Amino acid sequence: MTPEQSRKIHWASLEILERFGARLHHPEAISLLKSGGADVSDGNLVRIPSGLVEKAFTTVPKRVVLYNRHGQPVMPLEGNRCFYGPGSDCMNIIDHRTGERRRPVLGDVIEGITLCDALPDIDFAMSMVLPADVDQAIADVYQAQVMLAYTTKPLVLVSYELGGLIDAVRMAEAVVGGQDVLRRSPLVTCYINVVSGLNHNKEALQKLLYLSGKGLPALYVPASTGGVTCPVTPAGAVALDNAGVLLGLVISQLRREGAPYIMTGMQPSPMDMRTMVTPYADPQRGIFQAMARYYGLPAFGWGGVSDSKAVDQQAAAEAALTLLAESLVGGNIIHDLGYLESGLTFSLAQLVICSEIIGWIEAFLGGVQVTDETLALDVIAQTGPEGHYLNKEHTRQHFRESWSPTLFDRTDYKTWQDRGGRTLEQRAAERVEAILKEHEPTPLPDDVRAELCRIAEGATSR
């Protein structure tokens, strides 16, 4: 979108909030907004004056930094800097060993987090799947425990309700050394789904208020569907969901000025009226990133996704297209890598393929160095029109600088055939298995692991 189009959508979002209002299903959030100058009618219909929104922009940080377990700032969410990771809570997994589509277990979360820890192009981790072999009411607590134990990378949590989020944050505080350390060097953020831009459920508001109160970054994402809970047209969908994003921003800043806030950059997908499926690999999903650029706020994005049911040509094509598109528009936290079947199924092999694609994209976006050394005019002069560069020192010094795949195949046909003629899916599955056998995540100290177990056990008694 152009800056003028973004401006029009911003004004439309302000009008939606001021004229039509939103339903909020949490008394504390309503009271907070009312004390800030919002109008409340019909119990929970809240209208937000535009001045309240503009004031929130004066206090919210324009830059958020996520840290790893060692306290190192590894994810500065700013400008067009892109960081990549998987998604959460898929109901199915394609077993990389058997090819079977099945229900996941907690062991799959462990393997997925171990894989994220090992892959150099994966910057953060999410749970990937919903384990079916644990108490579903507190599955998010078990996920958080595994995530904190099996990777040192930043984490995007997903919690079902406030109690699970509190437990996960307590675990993170135990890992880094206390709540003050976690606030100064956040290892975690939480992805909060809202029913829609104008319908804010109690659970989402509770989590937003909790994170903002603690000074931890919140990801506030209206989960609208085009043609169902928001207009089917891209502009109308963005305007309505952006109103929800702005409402979340106001609440966070009223709760605590300066609370870090990460907005969504994901366009609501239109329902496919032929299949009644909400597609993930929709080509216009990334246009919401223009609003993040317009506001100068960090943004959540998506990529590496597919509506395919298998790790096949469609899955690879859609993963590559969505990753490239989101990288070009500058999504800061690009999640959902490895998603298949419109977010219902996850594949570790697909995640490995996405990691390879990211390497290609980063090389593509990295540009070219133009210096006397790289222009190599002296080497060209020495070689002459009929010479070659294979024996030149310049070639020896620089040939490794070009991106080289570790998974995609560049051999000739005979070599490929002699090596078994394996498909990309087969090679990716083998890579997954090799990593799981060889990689050992940095363990937590025994006392910290014990504290995480104690918190998880406490969740079972809630």
Regions found by a protein language model. Name each.
Residues M1-A12, F20, H25-L32, R47, ...:
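Catalytic-core signal marking the mid-to-C-terminal active-site face
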Residues T2-P3, R19-A22, G43-V46, R102, ...:
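Hydrophobic alpha-helical scaffolding
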Residues R23-I30, D42-G43, D123, L182-R184, ...:
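Flexible, glycine/charged-enriched surface loops at secondary-structure junctions
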Residues S31-E100:
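Glycine-rich, N-terminal phosphate-binding loop and its surrounding beta-alpha-beta segment
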Residues K34-D39, L187, T225, M266-P270, ...:
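Short acidic (Asp/Glu) and glycine-rich catalytic loops that position anionic groups and cofactors
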Residues R103-N332:
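Helix-rich catalytic cores of soluble enzyme domains
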Residues Q289-L390:
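Hydrophobic alpha-helical bundle architecture
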